[in-house]
From Swiss-Prot:
The gene is hemA. It comes from Exiguobacterium sibiricum (strain DSM 17290 / CCUG 55495 / CIP 109462 / JCM 13490 / 255-15). Its EC number is 1.2.1.70. Homodimer. Pathway: Porphyrin-containing compound metabolism; protoporphyrin-IX biosynthesis; 5-aminolevulinate from L-glutamyl-tRNA(Glu): step 1/2. This is Glutamyl-tRNA reductase. Possesses an unusual extended V-shaped dimeric structure with each monomer consisting of three distinct domains arranged along a curved 'spinal' alpha-helix. The N-terminal catalytic domain specifically recognizes the glutamate moiety of the substrate. The second domain is the NADPH-binding domain, and the third C-terminal domain is responsible for dimerization. The record marks 99 as: Important for activity.
């Protein structure tokens, strides 16, 4: 069996394409089942977010798996293969597994180390699992990817440093003034950046937040979400009088807060420090306001340097996670190799079970007066003996599948236990395919 992923993301496709090729919640269930029902596909999981749509499949032949997965995606959204293919990426085997681990860990995200994608992958997997479109391979692979991602985030701290300007603004405020719980904070602008800033402030413990915006309704919408108050931007001067922190992010073409506005506010503020953080481009606050006594003014360039430093830290942590991923995939590939001998193990267990049943039937004929309890006790002991006898042979055959001379070892094993030769042919074919895939990957890496 082979793992293939076909998809597109923010690196390969513009938003105009991504919004066309996106599975909504209402269609996800039907889509993942329909994908599994395509020719040559045995397991399927679909991950679809605003930044990516990815189809993971287990297939018996990589080339047919690729083709039918691409065709399914094009047909589902009413596109031709020619229209869709320029925006697609395709990974197979090791590369497909590595991609899943990187996505789940947040290493493939626009903001490296973000955790939202972890929940999205989990939801996609659980949906597929409930619909029984996953099996032996994906049940193990996705669980291991999720487990590694959780552990990596907990142990490396990759998500701790702010890497967006709005988050960096809040981090800077905490560094300079300490806890935000008792601070009066003014947010100017209720657009996407202003809303994200308000969210970050609220999550940092701020509860005295006032949002100013040209459109009062938009200010109220943002403020109400975070227990704040809202005012028209025309009332901003009153907000400056009591604010400890001002974070501004409007789309104005010129400065909306003049030096004299800050100077006037300072007359009523005693000796309290006044922190102004301007994350707008063009700038919202006149730069000369920072020259006033007690005023500390930072602009987007100051924050960009913080973001760059933090991103460098995240990339160091990301490198640690990459090494964990490599180790996890190597272990998973070893497990995949043993799948080729699963039919042999099953046959050996079936033979043992048949012997147990025949022996039990013989005992019942010779000892017709046995009670049900006696039969149960004897049956349990027979099963225990068989399991103990099989433990070493089963351990041997699993290890043998990963050895250089696996084919010879398995043939000897089959001959020893008088197992069906067709099972050996199936196992040998699977191991050859796995070896070819590994050899191809190593050749590419060289």
């Amino acid at each position: 069996m082979h793992i293939v992923v076909v998809g597109l993301n923010n690196k390969t496709a513009p938003v105009s394409i991504r919004e066309q090729v996106s599975f909504g919640e209402h269609e996800m269930k039907g889509a993942v089942v329909a994908l599994r029902d395509e020719k040559s596909i045995f397991e399927s999981v679909i991950v679809s977010t605003c930044n990516r749509t990815e189809l993971y499949v287990v297939t018996d032949q990589p080339h047919t798996g690729r083709y039918y997965t691409k065709r399914f995606l094009a047909n589902w959204f009413g596109l031709t293969m020619e229209e869709l293919e320029p925006y697609l990426f395709i990974h197979e085997g090791f590369d497909a597994m590595k991609h899943l681990f990187r996505v789940t860990s947040g290493l493939d995200s626009m903001i490296v180390g973000e955790t939202q994608i972890l929940g999205q992958v989990k939801t996609s997997f659980f949906t597929a699992q409930k619909l029984e479109t996953t099996g032996t391979v994906f049940n193990k692979l996705f669980k291991e990817a999720v487990t590694l991602a959780k552990r990596a985030h907990a142990e490396t701290g990759i998500g701790e440093n702010a890497v967006s300007v709005s988050a960096a603004a809040v981090t800077l405020a905490e560094q300079l003034l300490g806890s935000l719980e008792d601070k009066s904070i003014v947010v100017i602008g209720a657009g996407e950046t202003g809303e994200l800033t308000t969210l970050n402030l609220y999550e940092a413990g701020a509860r005295d937040i006032t949002v100013f915006n040209r459109t009062l309704a938009k200010a109220e919408e943002v403020a109400n979400r975070f227990e704040g108050s809202a005012h028209s931007i025309n009332e901003m001067q009153c907000g400056l009088l009591r604010a400890d922190i001002v974070i501004s992010s409007t789309g104005a073409k010129r400065a909306i807060i003049k030096r004299e506005d800050i100077a006037a506010a300072q007359l009523f503020r005693s000796d309290r420090p006044f922190l102004l953080i301007d994350i707008a481009v063009p700038r919202d606050i006149e730069p000369t306001a920072g020259d006033l006594p007690g005023v500390h003014l930072y602009d987007v360039d100051d924050l960009t340097s913080i973001v760059q430093q933090n991103m460098a830290e995240r990339m160091k942590e990301a490198a640690k996670i990459e090494r964990r991923i490599e180790a996890a995939i190597a272990e998973f590939e070893g497990w995949m190799t043993t799948l080729g001998v699963v039919p042999i193990i099953t046959e050996l267990r079936d033979q043992s079970l048949k012997i147990q049943q025949e022996t039990m039937q013989s005992l019942e004929r010779k000892l017709p007066n046995m009670t049900n309890r006696e039969k149960t006790v004897i049956g349990k002991h027979m099963k225990s003996i068989i399991n103990q006898l099989l433990r070493e042979p089963l351990s041997y055959i699993k290890d043998a599948a990963a050895k250089p001379d696996a084919e010879q070892r398995i043939a000897q094993f089959m001959d020893t236990f008088a197992l069906d030769e067709e099972l050996f042919d199936s196992a040998a074919e699977e191991m050859v395919l796995q070896e070819e895939t590994t050899a191809e990957r190593k050749a590419v890496n060289r």
